[in-house]
Swiss-Prot record:
Main location: cytoplasm
Gene3D superfamilies recorded: 3.30.230.10, 3.30.70.240, Elongation Factor G (Translational Gtpase), domain 3, P-loop containing nucleotide triphosphate hydrolases, Translation factors
GO molecular function, one term: ribosome binding
Family statement drawn from the similarity comment of this UniProt entry: Belongs to the TRAFAC class translation factor GTPase superfamily. Classic translation factor GTPase family. EF-G/EF-2 subfamily.
GO CC, any one term: ribonucleoprotein complex
Residues binding GTP: 26-33, 104-108, 158-161
Subcellular location: Cytoplasm
Organism for this UniProt entry: Lachancea kluyveri (strain ATCC 58438 / CBS 3082 / BCRC 21498 / NBRC 1685 / JCM 7257 / NCYC 543 / NRRL Y-12651)
Domain tr-type G stretches: 17-253
Protein name: Elongation factor 2
NCBIfam families: small_GTP
Pfam families: EFG_C (PF00679), EFG_III (PF14492), EFG_IV (PF03764), GTP_EFTU (PF00009), GTP_EFTU_D2 (PF03144)
Gene: EFT2
Length: 842
């Protein structure tokens, strides 16, 4: 047992070259938390007997009950390497003790915002893949997120015990299934990799892939076996590693290596990987599971495994676990892989700095981040808030990218909307104290230097969810995180007892702090709305709200889906609107924006903050826009960054720039609440064709222009074939063959469209992918389990907005029904106003 003290960890924090910040990411139920256990156990925090069952990083009660991870949890581990291994590390190191900051993240797609928060503060990722199920939809999503943050992956193929015990595969089959998994991971990596990272594909022969079983607590990399055999055969370890994977065969008669499958007589040879790596494992499994009492001691002696007194009495799975743990301890393989192949903060920040920092790449803050310099000004990014045991207070959880954070230090707390040189969204306050996050516990420390992950007390009142802490006055913010999911499911929350209202408001504030991807706001009709990414996410949020954050009984409305309003054609005539004092007129037309441009805006490829000339170049080259139009984009809306645009197509209008601010403000308002049923607009482009303004400045103030622009936008919108869009989930369902029929019948009832259906080679499992409207997804999981006898497991992730083909203005159609119901709920008049209501005659 390595019992270590906080002082030891603190002293290691200064050796930046010996730190590894990494997160564990994977598809749901591929065994992240279970695998993390074996690492935690090595650090001496939980006993060996519990490892694999304790799921130490699942700290919440509901996480233990449901058996899923909901929040990402951080823990620091201490590890030592032999001098021989340290020599093989490709980057600078000092000494042979290492500090590993590990974050166990959720795999369930509803919580992928937690994964984003975890990835931002780490430099490497351990991607866990299930041998039997292979690479799934969520594996791809999290890998894509990681590579987008320039994070280097290593892979662990987990649940090998399932392949051996449940499926009883042969050695060659297992090799093929490993090879397939490796290949599909590399395909994803090469698709999304960033040139700056270099080649980050994973190769078993280089030791960047481990194979093992988290439940049984064993794992190996090819390097470990190469170590054993290179001593025995007297060969160089590097050469041995290359031979233990791929098409290389060893001929025991001639004692020669070949890359042909047969020897000279045409007899088939056994693949080196099967012979040297899998064979001992298969033999142990068969001897122990078939209770061959006489073979076991011989095998153990050969493999140099010593059992203690009472361990000799065990049999079956219990014995198997102990033997495999002694033969190939999981922690050794994983720690070796993490330390040798993942970058230290010094290495990583060098290439991640430009992507993390919003300002220019030559200002002092960016240079300090690049060098990971503990003596520079402080730059710290808070990626999420963690609730403390004391109700209502939070630790700010983040990473020091430069400088050193000390208890009691005065810092500038910059929220996400802070602009250098202004005073908005900025507080200057002292950090009360710094703590080290250890799963369920925290340990106070005095200070924390660059490259480490830390929790801060006393900052929570000044930040909503994320932000930058710095001591350098000219510092820009660290870039805001891009979430791959968006909150599309909403419910209205009311209190049962009117006296509890203030508690609800306070609780909603705390809820929106504690979860990076939940939205809380108040609607026009005075309801409190909570929006989440899916059914499960919402359920957990509301349960937290009721039990922890507000602590009062609540009434919750049935879930409602967020829609978008859009147009399909160009306005059939020019929309004209006059100001209230009849002295100003705005003429405009609305038209649709191509889906790919909307997606590019939503993904941040076309950015409102970019230089307008560069942006116009991109839009002209990649999306076929007219350059003059692209240069004259006045604003994005709603919220200044949505997928709707105002383009100035006027010619020689006097005083035009004076009304620009008013027009922008009006468009933000109009695009946030569309004319059909008060939902946000999407993919609408408004071209201002002409403006007539009064010569006297007093008659063309905001009060005249804003309502005019809004009315004109609505009129143009309603003249351009308005439609509504509904959000659509991509569902991936894994199931055995006999359950496929049940899936189709449920999908048909729910307006789902099947996209693909394929069988995983070497397994009886089928993977069905389908599009399912979010509106129909409530209770989908339950119905699916009923129809398939509990054999199908759906994973739903928001995929795209789909336009409903029917006319939303006609109450008899499907779209019209949705509109009427929503207008009733919002307390508006039931029929949608016609364009005439917003259009003014000359």
């Amino acid at each position: 047992m390595v019992a270590f003290t906080v002082d030891q960890i603190r002293s290691l924090m200064d050796k930046v070259t010996n730190i590894r910040n990494m997160s564990v990411i994977a598809h749901v139920d591929h065994g992240k938390s279970t695998l993390t256990d074996s690492l935690v156990q090595r650090a001496g925090i939980i006993s060996a007997a519990k490892a694999g069952e304790a799921r130490f990083t699942d700290t919440r009660k509901d996480e233990q009950e449901r058996g899923i991870t909901i929040k990402s949890t951080a823990i620091s581990l201490f590890s030592e390497m032999s001098d021989d291994d340290v020599k093989d590390i490709k980057q600078k190191t000092e000494g042979n003790s290492f500090l590993i900051n590990l974050i166990d993240s959720p795999g369930h797609v509803d919580f992928s915002s937690e994964v984003t928060a975890a990835l931002r503060v780490t430099d490497g990722a351990l991607v866990v893949v299930d041998t039997v199920e292979g690479v799934c939809v969520q594996t791809e999503t999290v890998l894509r997120q990681a590579l987008g943050e320039r994070i280097k992956p290593v892979v662990c193929v987990n649940k090998v015990d399932r392949a051996l015990l449940e499926l009883q595969v042969s050695k060659e089959d297992l090799y093929q299934s490993f090879a397939r998994t490796v290949e599909s991971v590399n395909v994803i990596i090469s698709t999304y990799a960033d040139e700056v990272l270099g080649d980050v594909q994973v190769y078993p022969s280089k030791g960047t892939i481990a194979f093992g079983s988290g439940l049984h607590g064993w794992a190996f990399t090819i390097r470990q076996f190469a170590n054993r055999y290179s001593k025995k055969f007297g060969v160089d370890r590097e050469k041995m590693m290359e031979r233990l994977w791929g098409d290389s065969y060893f001929n025991p008669k001639t004692k020669k290596w070949t890359n042909k499958e047969t020897d000279t007589d045409g007899k088939p040879l056994e693949r080196a990987f099967n012979m040297f790596v899998l064979d001992p494992i298969f033999r142990l499994f068969s001897a122990i599971m078939n209770f061959k009492k006489d073979e076991i001691p011989v095998l153990l002696e050969k493999l140099e495994i010593n059992l203690k007194g009472e361990e000799k009495e065990l049999e079956g799975k219990a014995l198997l676990k102990i033997v495999m743990r002694k033969f190939l301890p999981a922690a050794d393989a994983l720690l070796e892989m993490i330390i040798m192949h993942l970058p230290s903060p010094v290495t990583a920040q060098n290439y991640r700095a430009e992507q993390l920092y919003e300002g220019p790449s030559d200002d002092p803050a960016c240079i300090a981040i690049k060098n990971c310099d503990p003596k520079a000004d402080l730059m710290l990014y808070v990626s999420k808030m963690v609730p403390t045991s004391d109700k209502g207070r939070f630790y700010a959880f983040g990473r020091v990218f430069a400088g050193t954070v000390k208890s009691g230090q005065k810092v500038r707390i910059q929220g996400p909307n802070y602009i250098p040189g202004k005073k908005d969204d900025l507080f200057i306050k002292a950090v009360q104290r710094a703590v080290l996050m250890m799963g369920r516990f925290v340990e106070p420390i005095d200070d924390c230097p660059a490259g480490n992950i830390v929790g801060l007390v006393g900052v929570d009142q000044f930040l909503l969810k994320t932000g930058t802490l710095t001591t350098f006055e000219g510092a820009h913010n660290m870039k805001v995180m891009k979430f791959s999911v968006s909150p599309v499911v909403q419910v209205a929350v009311e209190v049962k007892n009117a006296n509890d209202l203030p508690k609800l408001v306070e609780g909603l504030k705390r809820l929106s702090k504690s979860d990076p991807c939940v939205l809380t706001y108040m609607s026009e009709s005075g309801e409190h709305i909570v929006a989440g990414t899916g059914e499960l996410h919402l359920e957990i949020c509301l349960q937290d709200l009721e039990n922890d954050h507000a602590g009062i009984p609540l009434k919750i409305s049935p879930p409602v889906v967020a829609y978008r309003e859009t147009v399909e054609g160009e306005s059939s005539q020019v929309a004209l609107s006059k100001s209230p004092n009849k002295h100003n007129r705005i003429y405009l037309k609305a038209e649709p924006i191509d889906e790919e441009v909307s997606l590019a805006i939503e993904a941040g490829k076309i950015n409102p903050r970019d230089d307008f000339k560069a942006r116009a170049r991109v839009m002209a080259d990649d999306f076929g826009w007219d350059v003059t139009d692209a240069r004259k984009i006045w604003c994005f809306g709603p919220d200044g960054n949505g997928p709707n645009l105002v383009v100035d197509q006027t010619k020689a209008v006097q005083y035009l720039n004076e009304i620009k601010d008013s027009v922008v403000a009006a468009f933000q308002w109009a695009s946030k609440e569309g004319p059909i049923f008060g939902e946000q607009m999407r993919s609408v482009r408004v071209n201002i064709l002409d403006v007539t303004l009064h010569a006297d400045a007093i008659h063309r103030g905001g009060g005249q222009i804003i309502p005019t622009m809004r009315r004109a936008t609505y009129a143009g919108f309603l003249l351009a074939e308005p439609k509504i869009q509904e959000p659509v989930f991509l569902v991936e369902i894994q199931c055995p063959e006999q359950a496929v029929g049940g899936i189709y019948s449920v999908l048909n009832r729910k307006r789902g469209q099947v996209v693909s259906e394929e069988q995983r080679p070497g397994t009886p499992l089928f993977t069905v992918k389908a599009y399912l409207p979010v509106n129909e997804s409530f209770g989908f999981t339950g119905e699916l389990r009923q129809a398939t006898g509990g054999q199908a497991f759906p994973q739903m992730v928001f995929d795209h907005w789909a336009t409903l083909g029917t006319d939303p203005l006609d109450p008899t159609t499907k779209a019209g029904e949705i509109v009427t119901a929503a207008r009733k709920r919002h307390g508006m008049k039931e029929e949608v106003p016609g364009w005439q209501e917003y259009y003014d005659k000359l």
